[in-house]
A protein has these predicted regions:
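Active-site neighborhood of phospho(di)ester-bond hydrolases with catalytic His/Asp-centered motifs
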Residues: 17-19, 44-48, 74-79, 157, ...
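SH3/SH3-like beta-barrel fold
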Residues: 275, 290-296, 332, 345-349
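SH3/SH3-like (including bacterial SH3b) beta-barrel domains
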Residues: 260-277, 281-284, 310-341
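Acidic, His/Gly-enriched loop-helix segments that form or flank divalent-metal centers
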Residues: 122-217, 224-228, 240, 244-251, ...
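Active-site neighborhood of divalent metal-dependent phosphoester bond hydrolases
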Residues: 53-146
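Active-site environment of divalent metal-dependent phosphoester hydrolases
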Residues: 22-26, 52-55, 81-85, 163, ...
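N-terminal active-site segment of His-dependent metallophosphoesterases
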Residues: 1-62
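Boundary regions of SH3-family modules and the immediately adjacent low-complexity/disordered segments
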Residues: 295-327, 336, 349-365
Length: 365
């Protein structure tokens, strides 16, 4: 059975909801400032995955712990948040060594390194206990987080719900349910979740929250630390009696650049999933240098994609960027750059779109 916090909201209030910051606490702090967050008036719900996928775990955790001292702030746990406890005290020695050698846990290792431990090949149990004792307050905070928040009209959860009696589902499902945005649920309430990056859902060419009112689902995962171009999203809910209005703010990861001239290219973008198989086509006059032209073997959609965002395995080509992603920008707008290839950059634009923008229209200095 899930550990659920029930909140009876007043007739008028504002809820700010964020999720999947994945150690990016500074962007989260900027985002809350952008939302004009008022700790004495607003509710703040953080839907898990505070940790991992980044390199500032300890500071991120302590930042969230400080926020949570306010009774109007509720933090729930995500699947990535559980790893630090498992590595500290959950796994037996054999499992610890197996996982650790395969993929060292970033948060646990960050904690260990902060007290001078860099190797667990000897005296692993003693060292793990020392890490746990040193960070017992932080690890206990994570382990005591609830699984969900329920209000009059909404369910807030990390990954999603399952079944009419969703209160009784396992915590593992609550934290790991895959692609919930594409599923149906039996509750009459709107479910607000993270866990699955919005860019990967194929609904839009951006990381912005997805509103599926037919399914009563809102996904707010901006892909921070997961997708190449990523951000932390905030869903702002203004409650006025029985009316709920939604607003979105976001904070891209990284430093903003400036667009120095207008750019627009009319191409239709097509969703691409790295698990799908693609065929490599011959380039034509509309294939920019540094790009390849491909066809999706499932949908037959054709388009171009940066060659650096493609790979060949299992006898097929695969890509991990949407086809024909060339968002429009205007002079003076902000833009965030994540990769450079040929004459283009992979960016998040001020409108939130993700894609290739020519270097010549960006002040990269």
């Amino acid at each position: 059975m899930l550990n659920i916090v029930n909140v009876s909201l007043p007739s008028r209030c504002r809820i700010i909801c964020i999720s999947d910051l994945h150690t990016h606490w500074q962007e989260t702090k900027k985002l809350l400032e952008h939302c004009n967050y008022k700790p004495d008036e607003d509710y703040l719900f953080i839907l898990g995955d505070i940790l991992e996928r980044g390199d500032d775990n300890i500071n991120a955790l302590r930042y969230v712990m400080k926020l949570a001292e306010n009774k109007r702030v509720i933090v729930i746990s995500g699947n990535n948040d559980m790893f630090v406890h498992d590595f500290a005290v959950g796994y037996n020695q054999e499992k610890f060594c197996g996982y650790f050698n395969k993929k060292p846990n970033r948060c646990f290792m960050e904690m260990a390194e902060s007290i001078g431990i860099t190797d667990f090949s000897e005296q692993a149990d003693e060292k793990r206990k020392l890490v746990y004792e040193t960070f017992k307050t932080e690890i206990s905070f994570i382990m005591n987080l609830p699984d969900a928040i329920e209000t009059q009209q909404h369910i807030f959860i990390h990954a999603g719900i399952e079944g009419i009696n969703w209160h009784n589902m396992t915590t593992k499902t609550a934290k790991n349910l895959h692609r919930f945005i594409n599923l149906n649920h039996e509750s009459d309430k709107t479910v607000i979740c993270g866990h699955f990056p919005c860019y990967n859902a194929g609904r839009q060419n951006s990381n912005l929250p997805i509103f599926d009112f037919e399914r009563r689902i809102i996904d707010i995962d901006g892909g921070a630390g997961v997708t190449l171009a990523s951000q932390v999203n905030a869903l702002i809910i203004d409650k006025n009696d029985d009316e709920y209005n939604y607003q979105v703010k976001y904070s891209p990861i990284g430093e903003a650049k400036t667009v120095i001239s207008d750019y627009s290219e009319s191409r239709t973008w097509y969703y691409a999933d790295r698990k799908q198989a693609f065929s490599l086509l011959s380039p034509d006059k509309d294939t920019p240098t540094g790009f390849i032209k491909v066809r999706n073997n499932e949908t037959n959609a054709e388009g171009v994609v940066p060659e650096c965002m493609s790979g060949y395995w299992d006898g097929d080509w695969h890509v991990w960027a949407n086809l024909n992603s060339f968002p429009s920008v205007k002079k003076g707008e902000s833009i965030w750059v994540y990769a450079e290839y040929g004459e283009y950059c992979w960016c998040i634009t001020e409108s939130g779109e993700v894609g290739s923008v020519p270097k010549r229209v960006i002040d990269l200095m």
